C-alpha cells in the first residue's frame, strides 16, 4: 500500500527561481569573494560578497543608477552601463581591500556578450583578479555602445527622441569612464 508521494519538493528559493544551490555550493567552495552580477531591463547590479559563518556580507556594490553621480545621462539598462557599473564596483572593492573574486551569474544564461560579462570585464579593468575567458566578452566597440549609436543614426528624426542623443553614446561612455577611474 502506498504511504505518500514519491517526489520531493524543491527548496523554496529554487522554486521561486532565485537560487541555484548546486552552483552556489561550487562558488562557496572556491573560498573567494563572489562577484554577484544581476541584470534587468532597466538596470544592472554588481556586488562583491564575502561568505562567513553568520551569512553573506556585501563588501562593495554598485548599481547602474549610481552612474548618474558621474554624469551618465544615457539609459541604465544597456551594455555600456553594465560595463561602467562593473568598473565602479571594482574600484569600490579595491578600496575595501579585495583583490580577487569569482563571478556569480545566478540563474542568468551564460551567453557570450551578455551584460553580466560586461560587468565582469569592468571589474577586471578596475584591477580585480577574476577568472575569465576572453571569448565571452563583447567586442570593445559594442561595449562602448557603437551598435546603439549606429541604430540611432538609421532611424528617422523623432523616432529616437528623448533627453539623450544616442548617436553620441560612445563619446559619452569614454567621458564617464574617465570620471569613474579618476574619482575613485
Swiss-Prot record:
The organism of origin for this protein: Natronomonas pharaonis (strain ATCC 35678 / DSM 2160 / CIP 103997 / JCM 8858 / NBRC 14720 / NCIMB 2260 / Gabara)
Function noted in UniProt: This is one of the proteins that bind and probably mediate the attachment of the 5S RNA into the large ribosomal subunit, where it forms part of the central protuberance.
PANTHER family xref list: LARGE RIBOSOMAL SUBUNIT PROTEIN UL18, RIBOSOMAL PROTEIN L5-RELATED
Keyword Ribonucleoprotein among UniProt keywords: yes
Stored Pfam families: Ribosomal_L5e
GO biological process: ribosomal large subunit assembly; translation
Family to which this protein belongs: Belongs to the universal ribosomal protein uL18 family.
Protein's UniProt name: Large ribosomal subunit protein uL18
Keywords (A to Z) from UniProt: Ribonucleoprotein, Ribosomal protein, RNA-binding, rRNA-binding
NCBIfam families: PRK08569.1
GO cellular component, one term: cytosolic large ribosomal subunit
InterPro entries on file: Rbsml_uL18_euk
GO molecular function, one term: 5S rRNA binding
Subunit structure: Part of the 50S ribosomal subunit. Contacts the 5S and 23S rRNAs.
